[in-house]
Each structure stands twice: as structure tokens, then as C-alpha cells.
Amino acid sequence: MRRKLVLASNNAGKVRELQTLISTSGFEIVPQGALGIPEAEETGASFVENALIKAYHAARHSGLPAIADDSGLEVDALGGEPGVHSARYAGPAASDDDNIDRLLAALDGVEAGRRGARFRCVMVFVRDAEDTGPLIAEGCWEGWIGENRRGSGGFGYDPVFLVPGTGLSAAELPPEDKNRLSHRGQAAAVLASRLRALTGG
């Protein structure tokens, strides 16, 4: 029987993506919402700090090993914003569309050559709430920000993140291509490999 692992997210898009990406880890993955665990307050100043806050929070509430990620969009012309504030860029209760609207407004008039950006992801695994040696993996996906939304797949900033060499936005990529290329896919591949080593898989 596979060991259970709690996934520290209530974001439906992220849960769906991570369940696919970590499915080879040898663990049975349970979203924290299924266990009645509320979202942790993300008070960290970095992606690593926020990912650890979420993972330890889920482990403490569930008594299970936990995995969490923190990720965001860094836009060169905005000095790296929205960064760790990506999910709340337009305010605490902002929707994906609200955040995209604010981003496009901030980049209004910025020419294509200055719209470089990257998605960054830090993914962590803690064995329990007292784990002093968490596993940490990172991924980075370079691209640039388009002037309009394109595509209906994915979530977050995917409709305005243009993927080099494809002519597509992240929201237009087939899921298997996105999982292979993305920041989250990169981090998950590293972490899944380490988890398989832990479980002997």
C-alpha cells in the first residue's frame, strides 16, 4: 500500500497539475482541502520560505508528509514583480483575471523587447512537521509577456506568458508539453525522483 502525502494547496489548477507531475513518486497524493486543512498564511519573503510555511502547516494539521510549492512570475521591466506576490498582485481576493489585468496595465506601452519574464517554482517535501532536512527543488521557465490573453488552458498568468520557440502562450500548450517545459514540471521531476529514492520506487 502506498504511503499518503498531503498536497499543501487548495488551488484547483495547481492541485490537478501537481497530482499529475508527482504521480510517479510512489506516494498517494491527497489535497489538503480533502482533509479540511485551511490555506496557510504566506508571510515569507521568498519562494522557498513560502513553500516551507505551507508544507509544515499541512504536515502539522494532517500528521502526514507534505509537499508544497510556491511559484510566481518575475517580469524584467517591473523589477522582478509580481514575484512572491503573484497570486495576490491585484489584491488579497484577486482572481487570475484581476492579476492579469493589473500586469497588462503595468506593461502598457512597454515594447516587446523589454517584456522578458520567467516563471519560477520552488517545491518542497517535509517528512513531518518537525523535519529539519526538507527536500527542496527549483525550476525556472523563461519567456515573455504578450499584450493580450491567448488560450484557455492552464491557470494563473498562463494566457499572457509566451513560450519561446512555440508561437504559443502557456495556456495554448497541450498539458503534456506544459508539464515537460514548465517551471513546476522541472521542479516536480527533480522532487519525484528524490521521493522515489525515499520509497524505494
Swiss-Prot record:
A single GO BP: purine nucleoside triphosphate catabolic process
UniProt-annotated binding residues for Mg(2+): E41, D70
EC identifiers of the protein: 3.6.1.66
Active site: D70 (proton acceptor)
The keyword Magnesium is annotated on this UniProt entry: yes
Reactions catalysed: XTP + H2O = XMP + diphosphate + H(+); dITP + H2O = dIMP + diphosphate + H(+); ITP + H2O = IMP + diphosphate + H(+)
Molecular-function GO terms, alphabetical: dITP diphosphatase activity; ITP diphosphatase activity; metal ion binding; nucleotide binding; ribonucleoside triphosphate phosphatase activity; XTP diphosphatase activity
InterPro entries, per the entry: dITP/XTP_pyrophosphatase (IPR020922), ITPase-like_fam (IPR029001), RdgB/HAM1 (IPR002637)
Residues that bind substrate: S9, N10, N11, A12, G13, K14, S71, F155, G156, Y157, D158, K178, H183, R184
Gene3D superfamilies in UniProt: 3.90.950.10
Required cofactor names: Mg(2+)
Alphabetical list of Pfam families matching this protein: Ham1p_like
Alphabetically ordered keywords of this record: Hydrolase, Magnesium, Metal-binding, Nucleotide metabolism, Nucleotide-binding
Cofactor-binding details, from the entry: Binds 1 Mg(2+) ion per subunit.
A single Gene Ontology CC term: cytosol
UniProt-listed CDD domains: HAM1 (cd00515)
Binding partners and assembly: Homodimer.
Role this protein plays: Pyrophosphatase that catalyzes the hydrolysis of nucleoside triphosphates to their monophosphate derivatives, with a high preference for the non-canonical purine nucleotides XTP (xanthosine triphosphate), dITP (deoxyinosine triphosphate) and ITP. Seems to function as a house-cleaning enzyme that removes non-canonical purine nucleotides from the nucleotide pool, thus preventing their incorporation into DNA/RNA and avoiding chromosomal lesions.
HAMAP family: Non_canon_purine_NTPase
Family: Belongs to the HAM1 NTPase family.
The protein's name in its UniProt record: dITP/XTP pyrophosphatase
